[in-house]
From Swiss-Prot:
Biological processes annotated in GO: beta-alanine transport; histamine biosynthetic process
GO cellular component: plasma membrane
Top-level division of the source organism's lineage: Eukaryota
Membrane topology, Cytoplasmic segments: 1-23, 173-182, 234-243, 290-362, 412-418, 464-473, 523-604
GO molecular function: beta-alanine transmembrane transporter activity
Keywords, alphabetical: Amino-acid transport, Cell membrane, Glycoprotein, Membrane, Transmembrane, Transmembrane helix, Transport
Protein family membership: Belongs to the major facilitator (TC 2.A.1) superfamily. Organic cation transporter (TC 2.A.1.19) family.
Species, as recorded: Drosophila melanogaster (Fruit fly)
Gene3D superfamilies listed in its UniProt record: MFS general substrate transporter like domains
Transmembrane regions listed in the UniProt entry: 24-44, 152-172, 183-203, 213-233, 244-264, 269-289, 363-383, 391-411, 419-439, 443-463, 474-494, 502-522
Segments on the Extracellular face: 45-151, 204-212, 265-268, 384-390, 440-442, 495-501
Physiological role: Beta-alanine transporter required for the uptake of beta-alanine by the glia. Required for the recycling process of the neurotransmitter histamine in photoreceptor neurons of the compound eye and therefore for photoreceptor synaptic transmission. Following histamine release from photoreceptors and its uptake by glia, histamine is conjugated to beta-alanine by e/Ebony to form the inactive metabolite, carcinine.
The encoding gene: Balat
Name of this protein: Beta-alanine transporter
Subcellular location: Cell membrane
Length: 604
């Protein structure tokens, strides 16, 4: 049974859907943004230098003096963060005790540095570190000294968070079909709030790491649940709208998170600030309906009909008296057909790779999905490392997404999916790579790259859902999205490698985007096309192969003969047409076969 027909009878986008989406589903996008990226500031690394116990009395008031006495400089002239001078600081302390403050400020330790100019050795920090608290009053890095040879533990926390997301995305696919959309969402939300709030009371790094893993388990589910519910409550003509609005809500969550971080600078307080207010979402538990589409799919017809009646009443639609009878009759027929089909056909992941066209489309979609997820998460993680005000950079990273979605909305309706996906990824990739040539405008190029990846991140799931056949659509979407979650595991390591070369992660992410952009040209356009229902229909839709000859030939009349020209051998890589005459008569039609996509066209 086509549920979209049922929605048209009760109102596919009326007051009921608008109230649910605006009051519940859009605010529900905030937890994902909060918990996915608050860790960047909970585990922020402030400026630091080696602690020298003998110079401790002067550290607070004469920081520059203490650094000159104890800290060497790097090649770029900055003070080292992981090394110090090995000196007899007892003699220096005796000298400092008898110097008045004005003399100390004036001399800047020039005389003291001459005491041991040749014999001074540089050694790693021996007694811990002093941290700059002008930006953050406290972070996990400060509390557990996750710097220097322990700095990789910060990256490890992001990797573990990504592993949790990978597993959570896999488990959520089962729970959402087993429990339903609403119970799954609130179960994950409760687990997320408890784990994030508990991490504020962690007593060591590994306890905090384990709790962040649990938070990572819930983030994909929290992100997917509002989107799935919104899509299933509206008609097909409003799904692009729901996709855009859902992403706008997510970007607003990033902007709001930047404001929360600006106010709360202690990591324990920040963990509570991004978790406890989300308990207010439970006040909507009895307002948010279960998906009637899912209820019908699992045979809970009475609950589905009850929700549909409420939907019709709120939307101001009067349904016919025989509405319930017709609906139940359709359900019986549909269930019998599905039972018969399930007895003969079972689909698995291998079905995505049986036919050559489906295999290629699955691999291309998965590659592009991996590139999108990796670069989007990577650029969001990279924002605080751009230099300058870290919180302002993160605010910009979220704010630049908002105008992108407003421009994308009409573009998807008038220009299609394929070219918008290609242009978005190409522009974003070129902007990221260009930071190597124009380092002075890295922030501007970063914003352009973020706008590009934000656009493609919206288009790809929509295009993928229109390319996978109905019988394996959910399976194909899950497969591609799960594989793409490897990106958030790998990308923190690339960002960690970029500590010595700031633009290195941007170059890697830009190259990945460009590769995915050109791969998107191999996919066929899906705008205004009927969705494939079976594997055979999906296999019959050929790849596009950039500017395939078959696409151009559709615009030309078949009965016009080209004027005879001198025969020229085609260049390598260009499509070649093979004429295959049938030996029936001299006037029979012939087949023109494209050598690239193997699509046959009949002409005179």
């Amino acid at each position: 049974m086509d549920f979209d027909e049922v929605l048209r009878e009760v109102g596919s986008f009326g007051l009921y859907q608008k109230v649910i989406i605006c009051s519940v589903l859009l605010p529900a996008a905030l937890p994902c943004a909060f918990h996915a990226y608050s860790q960047l500031f909970i585990a922020a690394t402030p400026q630091h230098f080696c602690r020298v116990p003998e110079l401790e009395p002067w550290t607070q008031d004469y920081v520059q003096l203490v650094k000159n006495l104890s800290i060497p400089r790097n090649r770029n002239g900055a003070y080292a963060e992981c090394s110090m001078y090995s000196r007899n600081y007892t003699d220096i302390v005796r000298y400092l005790e008898y110097r008045p403050p004005p003399d100390l400020l004036r001399q800047q330790a020039e005389d003291l540095l001459k005491l041991q100019p040749d014999t001074t050795q540089v050694v790693p920090c021996q007694h811990g570190w002093h941290y700059d608290k002008s930006i953050y009053s406290s972070t996990v890095v400060q509390e557990w000294n996750l710097v220097c040879d322990r700095s990789f533990l910060v990256t490890l926390a992001l990797v573990v968070f990504g592993v949790g997301g990978l597993l959570g995305n896999y488990v959520f696919g089962y729970l959402v079909d087993l429990w339903g959309r609403r119970p799954s969402f609130y179960a994950y939300l409760l687990l997320e709030i408890i784990a994030c709030a508990a991490s504020a009371f962690a007593w060591n790094y590994y306890t905090w790491l384990g709790l962040r893993f649990v938070v990572g388990l819930t983030v994909p589910a929290i992100l997917a649940s509002p989107y799935v519910l919104a899509i299933e409550l509206v008609g097909p003509e409003r799904r692009v709208f729901c996709t855009i609005v859902s992403n706008i809500a997510y970007s607003l969550g990033l902007v709001v998170l930047a404001g929360v971080i600006y106010i709360v600078r202690d990591w324990r307080e920040l963990s509570l600030a991004v978790s406890m207010p989300l308990l207010m979402l439970f006040s909507c538990f009895f307002v948010l309906p279960e998906s009637p589409r899912w209820l019908m799919a699992v045979g809970k017809t009475r609950r589905a009909i009850k929700i549909l009646k409420v939907m019709a009443r709120v939307n101001g639609v009067r349904v016919n008296r025989d509405f319930v009878e017709r609906l139940q009759r359709k359900l019986v027929i549909t269930r019998a057909a599905e039972t018969k089909s399930s007895m003969t056909t079972h689909y698995g992941i291998l079905d995505l790779f049986r036919g050559p066209n489906m295999r290629r489309k699955t691999l291309i979609i998965t590659l592009i999905w991996f590139a999108n997820t990796s670069v989007y998460v990577g650029l969001s993680y990279y924002a605080p490392a751009l230099g300058g005000d870290e919180i302002w950079n993160f605010f910009l990273a979220g704010a630049v997404e908002l105008p992108t979605y407003l421009l994308l909305w009409p573009g998807l309706s008038y220009f299609g999916r394929r070219w918008i996906l290609f242009i978005s990824m190409l522009v974003g990739g070129v902007a990221c790579v260009a930071t190597f040539l124009y380092p002075d405008i890295t922030l501007l190029l970063y914003c352009v790259g973020k706008m590009g990846i934000s656009s493609s991140f919206v288009v790809l799931p929509l295009m993928a859902s229109e390319l996978y056949p109905t019988v394996v659509r959910g399976l194909g979407m899950s497969f591609s999205s799960v594989i793409s979650m490897v990106g958030p595991i790998v990308i923190p390591m690339i960002n960690h490698m970029g500590q010595q070369m700031l633009v290195l992660p941007l170059i890697v992410m830009g190259a990945l985007l460009i590769l995915g952009g050109f791969a998107s040209l191999l996919l066929p356009e899906t705008r205004n096309r009927n969705l494939p229902q079976t594997l055979e229909e999906g296999e019959a839709v050929p790849l596009s192969f950039l500017l395939c000859c078959c696409v151009e030939s559709e615009r030309k009349p078949n009965n016009i003969r080209a004027s005879p020209k001198k025969r020229i051998l085609p260049e390598a890589g260009t499509p070649v047409f093979h004429r295959v005459d049938t030996p029936v008569s001299d006037r029979v039609p012939c087949k023109i076969v494209c050598s690239i996509c193997k699509n046959e066209m009949r002409t005179l």
